[in-house]
């Protein structure tokens, strides 16, 4: 079924062969509950608990392709979620740092990605993804899997010169767009909105009191 999904995504316009091969090699059904496994290859988001979803395959493929990974990059992912996107990044990049704010999802991803799949190039943290992972920065690529009203300043600061960030931008109940932010070697940023999308909102830890 993964092979058929990759072939369908190719027909839908995904052109990066490495992205399609990674999708073909990874069983999406492992990242959803057993009662939803029959729907794992449908092109729609599926619930994963805690009010969160695994994104539809086309959007996952589009975002991954938009990163323009060549292999070897240091990647920050904000929103581990089910771990499916994380596992794809692990196949395509050098090293992946992924942050998840929901404790239950963070624990589940750790068990699946590190213990079951043994992904040695993946680092996981439970915390506020909008703050990034400062001690591991800078990152050549940043991927955000929840929508923020604007690009979080901490993530912008952690994007390396020559780097590329892909993220949904917009309010939770209004129009959202997928934005690609590129930082030139001179530090100057350019951005482009490339796809209308609908994502769950990026959540934050409450301030310390």
Swiss-Prot record:
Keyword Membrane applies: no
Single GO molecular function: protein-L-isoaspartate (D-aspartate) O-methyltransferase activity
Function: Catalyzes the methyl esterification of L-isoaspartyl residues in peptides and proteins that result from spontaneous decomposition of normal L-aspartyl and L-asparaginyl residues. It plays a role in the repair and/or degradation of damaged proteins.
Broad class of where this protein is predominantly found: cytoplasm
InterPro entries: PCMT, SAM-dependent_MTases_sf
NCBIfam families cross-referenced by the UniProt entry: pimt (TIGR00080), PRK00312.1 (NF001453)
Keywords, comma-separated and alphabetical: Cytoplasm, Methyltransferase, S-adenosyl-L-methionine, Transferase
EC number: 2.1.1.77
Family: Belongs to the methyltransferase superfamily. L-isoaspartyl/D-aspartyl protein methyltransferase family.
Chemical reaction(s) catalysed: [protein]-L-isoaspartate + S-adenosyl-L-methionine = [protein]-L-isoaspartate alpha-methyl ester + S-adenosyl-L-homocysteine
Pfam families in the record: PCMT
GO-annotated cellular components: cytoplasm
This protein's name: Protein-L-isoaspartate O-methyltransferase
Gene behind the chain: pcm
KW S-adenosyl-L-methionine (keyword) present: yes
Active site: 55
Subcellular location: Cytoplasm
């Amino acid at each position: 079924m993964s092979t058929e999904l990759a072939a369908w995504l190719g027909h839908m316009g995904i052109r990066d062969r490495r992205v399609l091969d990674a999708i073909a090699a990874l069983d999406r059904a492992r990242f959803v509950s057993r009662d939803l496994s029959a729907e794992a290859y449908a092109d729609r988001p599926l619930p994963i608990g805690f009010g969160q979803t695994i994104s539809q395959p086309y959007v996952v493929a589009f975002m991954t392709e938009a990163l323009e990974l060549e292999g070897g990059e240091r990647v920050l992912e904000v929103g581990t979620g089910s771990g499916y996107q994380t596992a794809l990044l692990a196949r395509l990049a050098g090293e992946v740092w992924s942050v998840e704010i929901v404790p239950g999802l963070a624990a589940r991803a750790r068990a699946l990605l590190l213990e079951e799949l043994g992904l040695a190039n993946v680092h996981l943290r439970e915390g506020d993804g909008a703050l990034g992972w400062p001690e591991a920065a800078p990152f050549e690529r940043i991927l955000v899997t929840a929508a923020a009203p604007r690009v979080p300043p901490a993530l912008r600061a952690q994007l390396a010169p020559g780097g590329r960030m892909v993220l949904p931008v917009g309010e939770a109940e209004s129009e959202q767009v997928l934005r690609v932010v590129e930082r030139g070697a001179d530090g100057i940023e350019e951005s482009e909105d490339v796809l209308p999308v609908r994502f769950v909102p990026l959540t934050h830890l409450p301030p310390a009191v």
